[in-house]
């Protein structure tokens, strides 16, 4: 179990949120590995759009889940100081992306 996964489990027990980034980078890797794109430029554009729209959607989904939970339980909102490690991808998926650089940049 990686550090980011442990942080995600702790956060899910405390606040109801979930660490999406392990699953998000897994989806990116699978999309790059399974799909065969006709040109490098098209691959670059698709990855760029997917990363930003997917990242925004997952952040919005996680925020709404926390907001609904706190409002339904009528808990006073307390500002949470988020550390960089809370939303940083695990070392496993960083290693996967580093070793798949040939597929990303089409060398």
Curated annotation (Swiss-Prot):
Signal peptide coordinates: none
Keyword Glycoprotein found: no
Membrane-spanning residues: 15-35, 43-63, 87-107
GO terms for cellular component: membrane
Domain of life: Eukaryota
Residue stretches in coiled coil: none
Membrane topology category: Multi-pass membrane protein
Keywords per UniProt: Membrane, Transmembrane, Transmembrane helix
Protein name, entry field: Putative uncharacterized protein YJL120W
Further remarks about this protein from its record: Partially overlaps RPE1. Disruption phenotypes caused by deletion of this gene may also be a result of a defect in its overlapping gene.
Subcellular location: Membrane
Keyword Iron-sulfur: no
Effects seen without this gene: Confers sensitivity to the synthetic tripeptide arsenical 4-(N-(S-glutathionylacetyl)amino) phenylarsenoxide (GSAO).
């Amino acid at each position: 179990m990686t550090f980011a996964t442990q942080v995600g489990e702790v956060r899910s027990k405390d606040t109801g949120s979930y660490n999406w980034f392990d699953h998000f980078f897994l989806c990116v890797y699978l999309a790059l590995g399974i799909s065969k794109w006709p040109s490098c430029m098209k691959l670059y554009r698709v990855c760029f759009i997917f990363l930003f729209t997917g990242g925004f959607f997952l952040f919005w989904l996680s925020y709404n889940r926390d907001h609904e939970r706190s409002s339904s339980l009528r808990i006073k909102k307390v500002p949470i100081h988020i550390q960089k490690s809370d939303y940083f991808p695990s070392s496993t998926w960083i290693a996967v992306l580093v070793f798949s650089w040939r597929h990303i940049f089409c060398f």
